[in-house]
Curated annotation (Swiss-Prot):
MF terms (GO), sorted A to Z: adenyl-nucleotide exchange factor activity; protein homodimerization activity; protein-folding chaperone binding; unfolded protein binding
Basic and acidic residues: bias regions: 21-40
HAMAP family: GrpE
Protein name: Protein GrpE
Keywords noted in UniProt: Chaperone, Cytoplasm, Stress response
UniProt xrefs under InterPro entries: GrpE, GrpE_coiled_coil, GrpE_head
SUPFAM superfamilies registered for this protein in UniProt: Coiled-coil domain of nucleotide exchange factor GrpE, Head domain of nucleotide exchange factor GrpE
Function: Participates actively in the response to hyperosmotic and heat shock by preventing the aggregation of stress-denatured proteins, in association with DnaK and GrpE. It is the nucleotide exchange factor for DnaK and may function as a thermosensor. Unfolded proteins bind initially to DnaJ; upon interaction with the DnaJ-bound protein, DnaK hydrolyzes its bound ATP, resulting in the formation of a stable complex. GrpE releases ADP from DnaK; ATP binding to DnaK triggers the release of the substrate protein, thus completing the reaction cycle.
Subunit organization: Homodimer.
Highest taxon of source: Bacteria
Example GO BP: protein folding
Length: 194
């Protein structure tokens, strides 16, 4: 039996020392192929950078869209809350008008019977509380008498001759108008001079 060392060498193979010498020879791959490969990799890198830039821009655009959407929803929530508040306040104003009419038509204090005084005082207290509550909510009455008619705040329901007032001056207020912040929730109904 022949050992591995004893095997005869095939004719086409050179001894190991001779093969080692050929390993240090010029590379088999020509230089232009390496340059082509580098150019190919640089092109791929550029394409990836462009794709990355596009994706980054898309992410930034989506983030901006989301931020705008969030702000819009916040504004809508605030507006909805204000509209609900305005609706409630607008529905309360006729009650306040009735309280004012009761007080305006009450007899003079000395003419009020003793038994009726607590009722009148109760209505006055109710008016004070309503006024304070409305003020806390940001509601304030619109000034009218003696001012020029301003259609943003006043609604003229009639005109009368008034010798002491200039034309379009408010001489009488039929119904008080109110503001909620800067927004008119009810125009003041007024009578103006001609």
């Amino acid at each position: 039996m022949m050992k591995h060392r004893d095997k005869p060498m095939p004719e086409n193979e050179e001894p190991l020392q001779e093969q080692e010498g050929t390993l240090h020879a010029e590379p088999a791959e020509p230089q232009p192929q390496k340059e082509d490969r580098v150019a190919e990799l640089e092109a791929a890198l550029t394409a990836e950078k462009e794709q990355s830039g596009k994706l980054r821009d898309e992410v930034l655009r989506r983030a901006a869209e989301f931020e705008n959407f969030r702000k819009q929803k916040e504004r809508e929530a605030v507006q909805s809350s204000l509209r609900a508040k305005e609706t409630i306040l607008r529905e309360l104003l006729p009650v306040l008008d009735d309280v004012e009419r009761v007080l305006a038509n009450a007899p003079e204090p000395e003419a009020i019977p003793v038994a009726a005084k607590p009722f009148i005082e109760g209505v006055e207290l109710m008016k004070k509380n309503l006024d304070r509550w409305l003020e806390e909510k940001g509601v304030k009455p619109i000034e009218a008498i003696g001012l020029k008619l301003d259609v943003d705040f006043h609604e003229a329901i009639s005109q009368i001759e008034h010798p002491e007032a200039e034309p379009d001056t408010i001489v009488e207020q039929y119904q008080t108008g109110y503001l909620l912040g800067d927004r008119v929730i009810r125009h003041a109904k007024v009578i103006v001079s001609r």
